[in-house]
């Protein structure tokens, strides 16, 4: 079997397992990079000819370790590549398409995860003040979207997937039909957020919650561009993504409650290890405060 056919079979399995489009796309990118490296080094793409030595050589190559501009990738990026290869070839071995997993010897490098880049409170004020002063329906939509991420901790994809009927403002809830892992979840809304969303929704009873002038649901890419433009116009110098709003929600909730399990529930993390990164941020805040005394 050729590598390209194996990649297609692996992606079909990921889809059947309910893996998110983001996860599938990352696996596809890593597998495609391996294919390009095999072609460049004139190695066979036949699975029968692909062993652990070839995979080790690929992971050690500039294609795997450097960006297109030649700058070295972060250790976390290379670790993600190793994980993708182990998962891909583990599937091929389990499916009987290879006699064994040639990537089983690839080990993840030890590294600390980078701290989450959260929207600071002063940046939040600048951003919301800018949007409040902007005229037009698009600014009202952007403001509501950002508040939903800031006050409820939604991922941008989950927020944009909401329809108007998914909001139960009387119960202060939003019913997220498709989150990162295709799980149906109930998200709790603060009284302030409920009032803002009530004004934003108005008399609408159907359709996408966040729609463009044509009435169609806006895309994640469009929302990301709008967010970047608003950040720049608000005078915020740091480069931030919409996910900084979700990070801000978690960081502030932990600072307020000190309860990591509560934050895990609010963030809808399956594992507490995904939430623990915010505890490291909170500890650094304490150190900074002590140094300032």
Locate predicted features:
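Conserved catalytic core of the tyrosine transesterase superfamily
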Residues: 1-293
């Amino acid at each position: 079997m050729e590598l390209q056919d194996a990649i297609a079979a692996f992606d079909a399995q990921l889809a059947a397992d309910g893996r998110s489009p983001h996860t599938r796309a990352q696996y596809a990118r890593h597998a495609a990079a391996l294919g390009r490296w095999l072609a460049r080094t004139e190695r066979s793409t036949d699975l029968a000819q692909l062993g652990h030595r070839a995979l080790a050589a690929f992971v050690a190559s500039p294609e795997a370790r450097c960006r297109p501009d030649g700058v070295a990738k972060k250790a976390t990026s290379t670790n993600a590549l190793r994980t993708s290869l182990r998962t891909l070839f583990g599937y091929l071995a389990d499916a009987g398409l290879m006699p064994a997993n040639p990537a089983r010897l690839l080990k993840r490098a030890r590294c600390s995860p980078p701290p989450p880049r959260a929207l600071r409170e002063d940046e939040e004020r600048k951003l919301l003040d800018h949007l409040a002063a902007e005229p037009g329906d698009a600014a009202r939509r952007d403001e509501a979207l950002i508040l939903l991420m800031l006050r409820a901790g939604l991922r941008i994809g989950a927020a944009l997937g909401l329809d108007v009927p998914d909001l139960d403002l009387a119960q202060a809830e939003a019913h997220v039909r498709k989150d990162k892992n295709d799980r149906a979840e109930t998200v709790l809304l603060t009284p302030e957020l409920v009032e803002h969303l009530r004004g934003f929704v108005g008399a609408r009873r159907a359709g996408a919650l966040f729609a463009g002038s044509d009435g169609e649901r806006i895309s994640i890419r469009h929302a990301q561009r709008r967010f970047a433009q608003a950040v720049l116009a608000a005078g915020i110098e740091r480069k931030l993504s919409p996910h900084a709003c979700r990070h801000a929600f978690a960081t502030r909730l932990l600072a307020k409650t000190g309860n990591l399990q509560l934050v895990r529930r609010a963030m809808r993390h399956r594992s507490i290890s995904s939430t623990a990164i915010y505890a490291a941020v909170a500890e650094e805040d304490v150190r900074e405060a002590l140094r300032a005394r």
